Each structure stands twice: as C-alpha cells, then as structure tokens.
Amino acid sequence: ASKFLQLLREAKASGVLVEEVTWARLAQVTGGSVHQGIALQTAAADTLDLSALIDGCSELGEPPLLLALDGITDPHNLGAVVRSAEAMGAHGLVLPQRRSAGLTGSAAKVAAGAMEHLPVARVVNLNRSLEKLKDAGYRVIGLAAEGDVTLMDVDLEGPLVLVTGSEDQGLSVLTRRHCDQLVRIPLRGITPSLNASVATALCVYEVARRNWMKDIHGQAPSPPIVRPQMKTQEVSSLPSAASENPQPEQPVVGQSDIDSNSLESD
C-alpha cells in the first residue's frame, strides 16, 4: 500500500489529475486488459523520421547500432525487442508503418519503460529505408535460418542495422535482397527456431559483447549511453503506467495535463 500511495503522491506532484473510479469503470476504460488497479492516460509515443535518426547517430562518437523489424505484428514481440535493445545499448529502431505492430499500450507495457528511451523511426517503405541507411554507411545484416555465416563469425564492426523478421515468415524475399549479409544463429535442440524477440536479443548482445562490453570486468560500471534526440523540441510522455500494489482499495485513473490519446494499464 505504501508504494501505491507514493505513486499517487508523485503523480499529483507532477500535475497529473487523479480520479478514483470503480473497478467496473477501470475495466471499461482499459478495454478489459490486465491491470493492477491503476491506469494512466498519456500522449502517443513520439517518433522521428529516418533522416533525423541517421543525422543524430552520426554525432554519437561510436558506431551506431540500429534495429529494423520486418513483419513483426505481435505487440508483445515488439515490446520485448524494444526492452532488450534499449538495455543492451542499441541506438534506435526502424519500424514500418505497415505490416507491423505499432507503439501501442500492449507494446509499451512489455517494454517496461524502455520505449521512453529508445528512438523509433516510423517508415513507409522498409526496403527503401534500408537502402538509405546503406547510403549513409551502414551495413545491413538480416537474421535468417539459411544465412551463410553464423552469428559468431560475422563481422559486427562499424555502423550496423540488424533486421529481424517474424518467427513464422522470417524476412520477406525483398528484404533479404536488400541485406548485405544473412546471418544465422546455430541451434542444437529439436526446436527449429527462436522467438523473434529472443533472436534479436541474442544478436544485440553479441554486438555489445564485442564492443562496449569488452573492457568491462567484475563490478565495473557500464559506459553511459548516448542516443539521438527523439524530437527537436521537448519530448512528451510516452505510454506508461505502473503500480506494484495488486489490490488498492479504490482503482484510480490518472490523466496527465497533456493532450492524451492513448490509454495504458499495468
């Protein structure tokens, strides 16, 4: 209860309008999704265009790592990719506007706060975007079971784009043609494939292991991460909400003082 009350105090101190409602009303406004007695209505997630992401990455002082998703339609997979990518130090995500999960409440919930920190570029055409990234000096590496080189052997130096397809369809034929190289993750068990978010996490970890992780030993801290600004102006709040108290006496709906068009629950 103390953590729940602390959350309410922080919300009120930040100018959030707090409204106590019935459980039935909370279920209605959250669309019946699983929650812990509290929901927050926020503005939609901020995104930036691809040119801004490329320009921002050019000023980082280290080789940028971007992820691109091809046909990932499950918001839980998207949220898991964002969470792993942000935690392991990726610099941004390229997300198609079509044939892709969006930056929804479900994705934000699985991302567990990471969506607020990882820049996302929404693009109309993924393959044209990959060509634009190659023109900017990036190598495009696609994850595919039929890849001609393993993850352990592939060159992961320099600016990179890692492209992941869906677990059932993989990369589209056209996307494969726009990759500089196809890489596979060797598997030993009977299970023929990995979840898309898990495969992506393994690849991002391998890039990190060969780069910023290589000089870290014992309890040495990780180097700070610098990423492109998500907007040239002040960044609005992204979809998020949380409470660690599973059963407060009265459900609460919080509404921020910004234009709100998405509803989140946790």
Where are these regions (language model features)?
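Short, hinge-like loop/turn segments at secondary-structure boundaries
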Residues: 35-38, 109-114, 157-161
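N-terminal positively charged helical leader segments and presequences
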Residues: 1-55, 220-266
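A short acidic, often aromatic-flanked loop/helix-cap motif at beta-alpha or helix-coil junctions
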Residues: 24-29, 46-48, 126-129, 149, ...
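Short, well-ordered secondary-structure micro-motifs
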Residues: 31, 79, 105-106, 131-133, ...
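RNA substrate-binding interface of SAM-dependent RNA methyltransferases
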Residues: 1-13, 59-147
